[in-house]
Amino acid sequence: GAPCNLTWREAGERERLWVTSRQHPIAQGLPDHFELETEEMYGEPFGVPEPLETVFISWFQGGEVFRSGLTYRRRAGNICYFRPGHETYPTYHDATVQKVISNAVKWAYNPATRIANPNDAPNTSIDIALEPLVERGPRLHHAGEKGFR
């Protein structure tokens, strides 16, 4: 994983979020920028993998900037990182923040067929191995017994 290291400050400062990817579905219906009057500051550098897209960049009253809206894809999943929000401040009551979260949920949804049983871990026989195989060593499971459940 990534260290996710960053600088931060709890000072209730103003945050201005700029939309940097106007055509992204997460930014649909949003103004070019919006402000949150009291927020916790996060500052660069931010130790995360390079995102697929950066949808928002924040500027804070103290002068710091931060990549506040990042997207990733992992296997069949879409992931959105959205920075604003602190237990001390009323961030989630802001209508624009609520719109971002709603858009992000819609964007992240993947209607593809789900894995029927994500805990299914079949114990396959050496008889169906691609190469000839001789069983060696102790066994934890009996032939045909399922593994992780």
Region roles according to the model:
Residues 2-76, 135:
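Catalytic beta-strand/loop cores that center a nucleophilic Ser/Cys/Thr
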